[in-house]
Amino acid sequence: LQDQVAQDQASGAAGFFKAIADNKDNSESLREDAQTAYEIVSGTYNSEYGKEPSWYAQRVHLGAKNDATSIEEMKNVLPYLPKVNEARTSHNRSVLGISLTDMAVAMIDADYQTGWLDHPDSLYQSENLTTYMQEPVQSWMQEEETWNEMVKEHPEYADVLNSSYNIYAFFANHYNEYLQVGHFLNLMNPELTHFGMGRLDDSAVSWDVNDVLDVSNPLSVEAYTDLFNKYSKDVLKEDQLNTLKANVATANQNLVAAQNAVKSAQN
């Protein structure tokens, strides 16, 4: 049983995405999203919209301990997800769903971060990175104060947050200013409908919106969390292992009791 657990854990995110893609009870759109995510974390993605980055083999260690694609790191990301929507709804922005493709892109891009933060040549349309592991979303939202000051000094910036196009135009035309507030602008983009996040051990957190698949029906954060927790519990076989450990403990107790009984009889 423990060998099977180790084998299932080793497949990491790939096993999770493949299980969803192969489940015919899931919607066609969810299965497509999962299949794309599977190919991305497995290093096999190649389509007219893009292909696996050249650095994949050097940076991604699928399912390995502390890798962003490991079951443990996927679990560590879960508390971050609702924080994104809390930040958005507090600013009258829509709630975002979870795209499995976004999650996959975020995972491999988190893996790219080794010692410093760097936006890799990858499959994202929009990306935030941080080393603040406890409150990554809050670290990006802190740029709001700087943005508000910018708008006071430049009233013409007031319409930047009205559309994705305006945000991109601000990036293209005011790059130095964008570097100071881009994370906040990305999170507040009014046209977003989905996102994903990844975490590399204690090194970096990534937030991504992919550039390869238009996900029309993303999972809610709650639905994704439930889906992952169920898979994780099945993969880790927690119930079976706990039963096994309890049986071993009981057997050991019975053995000790029997040995003590024999000693008492001999005396």
Identify the residue ranges that each predicted region occupies.
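Long, non-membrane, amphipathic alpha-helices that form coiled-coils
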Residues: L1-A10, K230-N267
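Short, well-ordered surface patches within globular domains
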Residues: D3-S126, E135, F184, N189-D202
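A well-ordered secondary-structure block
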Residues: Q4-Q7, A13-A14, D121-S216
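Extended aliphatic helical segments
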Residues: V5, I20, V41, V60, ...
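A general marker of short, structured functional hotspots
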Residues: G12-A13, A34, V41, N76, ...
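Residue-level detector of solvent-exposed, low-hydrophobicity positions
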Residues: N23-K24, Y45, W147, H154, ...
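Long, amphipathic alpha-helical segments that form or neighbor coiled-coils/leucine zippers used
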Residues: Q35, E39, T44, L213-A246
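Sequence-level detector for tyrosine residue identity
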Residues: Y38, Y45, Y49, Y56, ...
